[in-house]
């Protein structure tokens, strides 16, 4: 058969090409609404795209009152917990009937979050009940959605509490006579309210966050912090804003909660109904129209909907062994599909798509991941690794989750190019080192050679790993403006620490680079929020030879008092207690320097900790006990060390013993000279 070319080939390629539409967020069905699971709800469907989010405004006096309360709670200067609890009770009384106005106000929504974090169980149920009938509306609101997320996390904690301490009463009441059901029933009632709107929530800018949190709660997964940088729930802007307004999570965050069995059934029902809406009630994968598959794939690369789809794929195995959502996105047969190939190529070239693929690889069945790898990526793994903002992250995911045979093949292909890959993606070095360690240090020598070639090349006259890896000359080191260490500095420091722990060559190289710095520059590293960890990482007593230890201590001991009183330097001072083992002169020199500045050291929070860790009270009051402590430390660190014998011991032995002793002394002397060299 003739090879297709020209217009026919171009037309076929354009047909198979995956190009997401610009209007993914709307995702309107082009089929009759009668096919949807929730039939006859046309009015609700129309409302779901534009829910009511205005519930009136507070008058000036009310606004000023709630503003003042918010600032009072933010300062948290209460004399007792009872006083704080009383204020929360009073605010909730004032807020009766105004809850919807408060949560949709920029300032007052912060107040409601603080109240929810501080209120007791009955008050929490009261707030939850006040939102009945408006949960969808509030989830779509810029400010109210954050309040809902806090409410859901606290509700999950109360759910577990009621589950572990059951009562015979299904209803409780507060002091005002207000009757509440169990938290489980209240939660299920809220979920029924949201069910008709699930599809629109998936791609809504704010409601998608609430939906993700609900899925995490229903599946008993970790509920992430709302402020930590690695939180999977909030957006980057949201986490920064939350830090600026200083709303701290309570103990209910960053935990996994037990949930009732009804939640698993509810999760299954919700996601099954959502699947039917996306597939228009198709009975099997083969019955789903190509248009529906394409539209769902568009959601996978949408910056709002993609995290929701990722989460659904991660947890669908709880209730669905067939993994319907995975099969909706990808095929499962062993043959290439042109449209799927175009979609995978788009994922590997798009920042959102590559993040999607990286995350679903971590939770998918291994046979599904292997299929994608062997069909579409195996033969071009190096090219993908060079896509530093997209495909590189997918390759790193393969290194973590593939079988040993495939990981070895990837390492064989990538390691020769490692020094080039590190130019744009330092994380690749971390992934390769971790993969090599898991495989019993597979190709470790080649990895080390490539890393040295990159950061400490032999042909360079001014080679310094601190400069090539940490970029010291352009860093915040030595700045007097109290600049925070940058994220890039933190990432580079962690990588260098990993290199130091990976191989002794990097430990030696790093120490040599530190000693080649001007002393002032080296000491500045000890006071830096990030680089101090690098200094700390090289202070490994058993791995560093005695000469290098002496050279390091000559510099570090010069400013030991100021270092001990510093938040970062004090950790290095603590580490020197062990690092000076068998170097008693240095240990005593540091101890005496700290004792000479007793007042300064003891007036510092960090200095007091160093004083304690160095047992300096013992040094001052019972010097012999302190020296005994040193001997115990040395014996613990070097249990096989030969104890020195008195010089006249050899004269007490017979001739043969003298000969053996002489040979032994010669041998140990020879070894010592070799060590010095």
From Swiss-Prot:
User: Its Gene Ontology molecular function terms?
Assistant: RNA binding
User: What are the UniProt keywords, alphabetically?
Assistant: Nucleus, Repeat, Ribosome biogenesis, rRNA processing
Record-linked SMART domains: Pumilio
Cell compartment(s), UniProt = Nucleus, Nucleolus
Pull one GO CC term from this UniProt entry.
nucleolus
Q: Would the keyword Transit peptide be found if you checked this record's keyword annotation?
A: no
Gene Ontology process terms (BP): endonucleolytic cleavage in 5'-ETS of tricistronic rRNA transcript (SSU-rRNA, 5.8S rRNA, LSU-rRNA); endonucleolytic cleavage in ITS1 to separate SSU-rRNA from 5.8S rRNA and LSU-rRNA from tricistronic rRNA transcript (SSU-rRNA, 5.8S rRNA, LSU-rRNA); endonucleolytic cleavage to generate mature 5'-end of SSU-rRNA from (SSU-rRNA, 5.8S rRNA, LSU-rRNA); ribosomal small subunit export from nucleus
Q: Does the keyword Zinc-finger apply?
A: no
Read off the Pfam families from this record: PUF_NOP9
Q: Where are the Pumilio repeats?
A: 94-129, 130-165, 193-228, 287-331, 339-374, 375-412, 516-553, 554-592
Q: List all Polar residues biased stretches.
A: 646-655
Regions of compositional bias (Basic residues) in chain numbering: 1-12
Residue ranges with Basic and acidic residues bias: 13-35
| Annotated spans, Disordered | 1-50, 639-677
- Cited function: RNA-binding nucleolar protein required for pre-rRNA processing. Involved in production of 18S rRNA and assembly of small ribosomal subunit.
> Which family is this sequence assigned to?
Belongs to the NOP9 family.
The protein's name: Nucleolar protein 9
Name of the gene this protein is made from: NOP9
């Amino acid at each position: 058969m003739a090879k297709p070319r020209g217009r026919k080939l171009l037309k076929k390629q354009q047909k198979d090409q995956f190009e997401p539409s610009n209007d993914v967020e709307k995702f309107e069905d082009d089929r009759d609404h009668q096919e949807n699971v929730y039939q006859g709800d046309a009015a609700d469907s129309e409302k779901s795209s534009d829910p009511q989010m205005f519930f009136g405004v507070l008058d000036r006096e009310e606004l000023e009152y709630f503003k003042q309360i918010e600032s009072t709670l933010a300062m948290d200067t209460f004399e007792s917990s009872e006083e704080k609890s009383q204020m929360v009770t009073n605010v909730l009384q004032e807020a009766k009937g105004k809850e919807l106005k408060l949560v949709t106000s920029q300032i007052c929504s912060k107040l409601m979050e603080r109240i929810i974090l501080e209120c007791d169980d009955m008050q929490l149920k009261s707030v939850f009940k006040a939102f009945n009938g408006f949960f969808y509306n509030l989830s779509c609101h810029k400010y109210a959605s954050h309040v809902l997320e806090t409410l859901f996390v606290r509700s999950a904690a109360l759910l577990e509490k009621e589950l572990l301490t059951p009562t015979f009463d299904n209803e409780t009441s507060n002091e005002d006579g207000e009757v509440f059901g169990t938290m489980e029933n209240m939660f299920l009632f809220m979920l029924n309210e949201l069910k008709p709107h699930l599809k629109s929530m998936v791609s809504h800018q704010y409601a998608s966050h609430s939906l993700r949190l609900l899925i995490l709660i229903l599946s008993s997964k970790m509920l992430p912090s709302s402020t930590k940088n690695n939180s999977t729930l909030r957006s980057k802007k949201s986490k920064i804003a939350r830090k600026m307004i200083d709303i701290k999570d309570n103990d209910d965050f960053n935990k996994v909660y037990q949930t009732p069995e009804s939640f698993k059934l509810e999760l299954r029902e919700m996601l099954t109904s959502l699947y039917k809406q996306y597939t228009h009630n198709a009975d099997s994968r083969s019955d789903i129209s190509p248009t529906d598959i394409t539209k769902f794939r568009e959601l996978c690369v949408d910056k709002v909907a993609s995290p929701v789809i990722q989460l659904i794929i991660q947890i669908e195995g709880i209730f669905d062994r067939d993994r319907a959502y995975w099969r909706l996105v990808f095929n499962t047969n062993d043959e290439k599909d042109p449209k799927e190939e175009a979609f995978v190529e788009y994922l590997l070239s798009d920042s959102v798509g590559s993040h999607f693929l990286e995350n679903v690889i971590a939770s998918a069945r291994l046979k599904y991941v292997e299929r994608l790898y062997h069909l579409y990526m195996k033969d071009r793994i190096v090219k993908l690794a060079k896509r530093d903002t997209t495909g590189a992250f997918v390759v790193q995911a393969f290194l973590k989750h593939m079988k040993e045979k495939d990981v070895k093949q990837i390492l064989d292909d990538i390691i020769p190019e490692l020094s080039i890959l590190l130019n744009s993606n330092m994380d690749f070095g971390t992934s390769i080192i971790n993969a090599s360690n898991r495989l019993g240090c597979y190709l470790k020598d080649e990895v080390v050679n490539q890393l040295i070639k990159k950061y400490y090349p032999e042909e360079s006259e001014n080679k310094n790993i601190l400069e090539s890896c940490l970029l010291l000359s352009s860093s915040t080191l030595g700045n007097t403006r109290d600049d925070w260490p940058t994220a890039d500095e933190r990432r580079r420091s962690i990588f260098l620490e990993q290199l130091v722990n990976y191989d002794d060559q990097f430990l030696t190289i790093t120490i040599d680079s530190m000693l080649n710095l001007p002393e002032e520059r080296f000491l500045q590293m000890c006071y830096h929020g990030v680089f101090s960890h690098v200094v700390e990482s090289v202070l490994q007593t058993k791995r560093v030879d005695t000469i290098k230890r002496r050279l390091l201590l000559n510099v570090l001991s010069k400013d030991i008092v100021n270092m001990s009183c510093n938040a970062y330097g004090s950790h290095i001072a603590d580490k020197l207690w062990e690092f000076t083992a068998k170097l008693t002169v240095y240990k005593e020199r540091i101890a005496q320097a700290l004792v000479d500045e007793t007042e300064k050291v003891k007036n510092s929070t960090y200095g007091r900790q160093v004083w304690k860790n160095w047992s300096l009270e013992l040094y001052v009051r019972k010097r012999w006990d302190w020296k005994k402590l040193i001997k115990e430390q040395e014996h613990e660190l070097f249990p096989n060390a030969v104890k020195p014998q008195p010089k006249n011991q050899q004269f007490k032995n017979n001739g043969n013993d003298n000969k053996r002793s002489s040979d032994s002394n010669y041998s140990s002397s020879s070894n010592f000279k070799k060590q010095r060299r």
